[in-house]
Amino acid sequence: MLNLNELKSGFHYFVMGWHFITQKGLRRFVIMPIVLNTVLLCGLFWLFISQISSAIDWVMNFIPDWLSFLSVILLILSILTILLLFYFTFTTISGFIAAPFNGLLAEKVEKMLTGENINDDGLVDIMRDVPRMLAREWQKLRYSLPKIIALFLLSFIPLVGQTIVPVLTFLFTCWMMAIQYCDYPFDNHKVSFDIMKNVLGNQRTQSLTFGGLVTCCTFVPVINLLIMPVAVCGATLMWVENYRNDLGFNMNKSFSSQTGLDVRSENTGIVK
């Protein structure tokens, strides 16, 4: 069920992400994710342009003749599915490459918001954390890949593959974007992937709204070059206002997806 308060807060965190990337103390930590984003997007854009015609022809071959009168609509939906699959490829690759930089950016944003250091690790300790960060990215890939494969197989079913699958793919992409970027502040505090997934699911409207805005902006030229650090900053603010007190400093507290959490935003006073 749609929660209007969560819808509003999801939009708020996305907008605030744009505000944070302009802050003087964060600019140098924003540059590297932007550079990586630019290189990856250029490479995948070239790949997309070179393969889009063949991909469309392949998908359209599954449309039966008796649905030819809907060919224009089905063509648009097929292109949307292909775009989302390319987008999933982009976020997967960028997640592995940019994980250390995004984790550091999330740490600096949290320090700016709270005035507290997450840890006092030196450069050597940070480098030792890189394998753990990459393992976390692999965990996200293991979670998402079976679902992407299932959606891909469903796309072979006539009509279903060109109507329902694009919608399901978009919703799943929104959910994965929330997981992808919220994971950086969660992981900085060693919060497990399953706990993170469950608490984000308890506020699903907020998560899908935030992830949906990130997804849509990825397809907008110029804006898509900045979206990675924007999403990290917005997700970190979401962590601080919604989850930090419950999870970051009270890890002995057991969590149950059946019971949930009473999560409040300190700034708004809204129970989400």
Swiss-Prot record:
Query: InterPro entries in the record, alphabetically?
Result: CysZ_sulfate_transptr, Sulfate_CysZ
Swiss-Prot/TrEMBL GO biological process terms: cysteine biosynthetic process; sulfate assimilation
Keyword Transmembrane in the entry? The reply is: yes
- Give one GO term, molecular function aspect: high-affinity sulfate:proton symporter activity
Record keywords, A-Z: Amino-acid biosynthesis, Cell inner membrane, Cell membrane, Cysteine biosynthesis, Membrane, Sulfate transport, Transmembrane, Transmembrane helix, Transport
Residue ranges crossing the lipid bilayer per the database entry? 29-49, 66-86, 148-168, 219-239
Q: Where in the cell is it found?
A: Cell inner membrane
Give coiled-coil spans as residue ranges.
none
Q: Tell me, what's a Pfam family for it?
A: EI24
Q: List the disulfide bonds.
A: none
> How is it placed in the membrane, per its record?
Multi-pass membrane protein
The terms describing its cellular component in GO are: plasma membrane
What does this gene product do? High affinity, high specificity proton-dependent sulfate transporter, which mediates sulfate uptake. Provides the sulfur source for the cysteine synthesis pathway.
Family the UniProt entry places it in? Belongs to the CysZ family.
| Protein name listed in UniProt | Sulfate transporter CysZ
Q: Which source organism does the UniProt entry give? A: Haemophilus influenzae (strain ATCC 51907 / DSM 11121 / KW20 / Rd)
The UniProt gene name for this protein comes to cysZ
